[in-house]
UniProtKB/Swiss-Prot annotation:
PANTHER family: PHOSPHOLIPASE B-LIKE 1, PHOSPHOLIPASE B-RELATED
Main subcellular location: secreted
Organism classification: Eukaryota, Metazoa, Chordata, Craniata, Vertebrata
Name of protein: Phospholipase B
Main EC class the enzyme belongs to: hydrolase
UniProtKB keywords: Cytolysis, Glycoprotein, Hemolysis, Hydrolase, Lipid degradation, Lipid metabolism, Secreted, Signal, Toxin
Localization, UniProt: Secreted
GO-annotated cellular components: extracellular region
Length: 553
């Protein structure tokens, strides 16, 4: 039995911040034996006692119930499914979200600790940066909670409150699991760090004194200080010539230390007229509420994909301030509140943090009439830099057959503001939107996509030894293998692919594979060659197949 009145020192800030929500709650626990691979659990809200109770059973009468299937070593993926708000009693949206977050933290706490242990030393290189990041995240968190408290009648901030309630639940679920296991739980900051991984890709350079001295940077400037680049991905939306089908897919690029993967199916019965959906299926990671990749199938009929854009113009990053919402928070809010590409963009642009500056693709399946038409508004493209979000309907481009995305801004204003024009002048046309290697490969090969297998093939494509556009560079292709670079091999590159079509999306279903590509005779990646990089809880080698991801509850 734990009372909020006696927090440990590491818990005090979060409990002060959430006092407007949860002051006086009492947590009660009923603990049962845990199964080895699939762990079921149910959270109950006890209204009379103002307390929560958890049992290691799957009870559909509970306020949040679900399971975690830990198959990472055998298939490359864990699978988490949670339903909340479908029990036999009415509960508030805040309690619903807290219960859902708590259940996720409880079920996945062990892998949350592994994921943090693997990524923190790669992202944070010294105590000065660590303290700057902690200070920024604390100020941002306090500002966010104050805005939620001050704007309870504003639909945007009300939905932001749901996200923060879920975050608080995640923290407490992790704490209680750790107490049961006699383990040290992740701290407040560590959970915030995990959720802000994408935002940190821009926030850390923004806080780094050496990079702030100039107004322009090159990628080697970042690589010299960190062992990761700006985080790249490949995405493709493919329309068959007669509109017979539409395929969509995404392949993530980042450090291989991030390959502790969880595919999540979440279904939250939020009763708010401004919340269009509480349902989403998406690729993700332990402790993260967002996809990060991004690859989402949403209950509103929207599909969301994302690839990262670099910001070479450092003067933009100097505008990053804590009085804003991180990208991961705004994505969650937009995913809940929007029912079209335009409303998603209009929601997402609010309180722009200027961190995790990406291209977002919103595909509205409600506007797709197979073998007939793609209505205006089928595809919206949204791009962000600090202080600016641009968006436009690009359905006319999609009608020509495909939309590719490969880490270079499409919008001319975003492209120029980010410094790509100057970067191309310095480093060549391969960094331009039209002439990048992946632009050429997508342009050449997208016509070969005729079915699901050919869509999988293009998203795993790496023929760097023979493809003239790759020029023998294992990262000048759709699915990078930076570990195969002869000059500077590092355990980073393309480590997954997620693929689906319109009919699968209607069932919240996709195919997903974890691990660097092995097509065209490429060797299976193994950590034995990179043991200096921490890889706690990860498979020793990656030779997995595609897994069908489908909710079952």
């Amino acid at each position: 039995m734990i009372r909020f009145g006696n927090p440990s020192s590491s818990d005090k800030r979060r409990q002060r911040c959430r006092s407007w929500y949860w002051g006086g709650l009492l947590l009660l626990w009923a603990v049962a034996e845990t199964r080895a691979d699939i762990h079921y659990a149910t959270v109950y809200w006890l209204e009379a006692e103002k307390s929560f109770q958890i049992k290691d059973v799957l009870d559909k009468n509970g306020d949040a119930y679900g399971y975690y299937n830990d198959a990472i070593q055998s298939t490359g993926w864990g699978i988490l499914e949670i339903k909340a708000g479908y029990g036999n009693q009415p509960i508030s949206n805040e309690i619903l979200m807290y219960a859902a977050g708590f259940l996720e933290g409880y079920l996945t706490a062990s892998h949350m600790s592994d994921h943090f242990a693997n990524l923190f030393p790669l992202m944070i290189k010294n105590v000065i940066i660590e303290q700057k990041v902690k200070d920024f995240i604390q100020k941002q968190d306090e500002w966010t909670r104050q805005q939620i408290k001050n704007n309870k009648d504003d639909p945007f901030w009300r939905n932001a409150g749901y996200v923060i309630a879920q975050l608080d639940g995640l923290y407490m679920g992790n704490v209680e699991w750790a107490k049961r296991q006699k383990r040290t739980p992740l701290t407040d900051f560590e959970i915030s760090f995990l959720n802000a991984i994408g935002d940190l890709l821009d926030l850390i350079p923004a806080l780094h004194s050496e990079l702030r001295k100039s107004d322009f940077r090159s990628m080697p400037d970042v690589s010299r200080i960190y062992q990761w680049d700006m985080g790249h991905c490949s995405a493709l939306i493919k329309v068959l010539p007669g509109y017979e089908n539409i395929y969509f897919a995404h392949s993530s690029w980042f450090t291989y230390a991030a390959t502790l993967r969880i595919y999540k199916h979440l279904d939250f019965r939020i009763t708010d007229p401004q919340t269009k959906t509480g349902r989403a299926s998406f690729s993700s990671y332990p402790g993260l509420f967002g996809s990060l990749d991004d690859f989402y199938i949403l209950g509103s009929g929207l599909i969301m994909l994302q690839t990262t854009n670099s910001v070479f113009n450092l003067s933009l990053l100097k505008k990053v301030v804590p009085e804003s919402l991180f990208a991961w928070e705004r994505v969650r809010i937009a995913n809940m509140m929007a029912d079209s590409g335009k409303t998603w963009a209009e929601t997402f642009e609010k309180q722009n943090s200027g961190t995790y500056n990406n291209q977002y693709m919103i595909l509205d399946t409600k506007k797709i009439k197979l073998q007939r038409s793609l209505e205006d508004g089928t595809l919206y493209i949204i791009e962000q830099v600090p202080k600016l979000v641009k968006y436009s309907d690009q359905t006319k481009v999609l009608r020509n057959g495909y939309w590719p995305s490969y880490n270079i801004p499409f919008d001319k204003e975003i492209y120029n503001m980010s410094g790509y024009g100057e970067y191309v002048q310095r480093h060549g046309l391969e960094f331009s939107y039209e002439m990048a290697p992946r632009a050429k490969i997508f342009r050449r090969d997208q016509g070969k996509v005729t079915d699901m297998e050919s869509m999988k093939f293009i998203m795993r494509y790496n023929n760097y030894k023979e493809d003239p556009y790759a020029k023998h560079n294992p990262c000048n292709t759709i699915c990078c293998r930076q570990d195969l670079d002869r000059r500077t091999p590092v355990p980073a590159g393309c480590y997954d692919s997620k693929v689906a079509d319109i009919s699968m999306a209607a069932k919240f279903t996709a195919y997903a594979i974890n691990g660097p590509p092995v097509e065209k005779g490429l060797p299976v990646f193994s950590w034995v060659h990179f043991n200096k990089t921490k890889h706690q809880g990860l498979p020793e080698s990656y030779n997995f197949d595609f897994v069908t991801m489908k909710p079952v509850l």
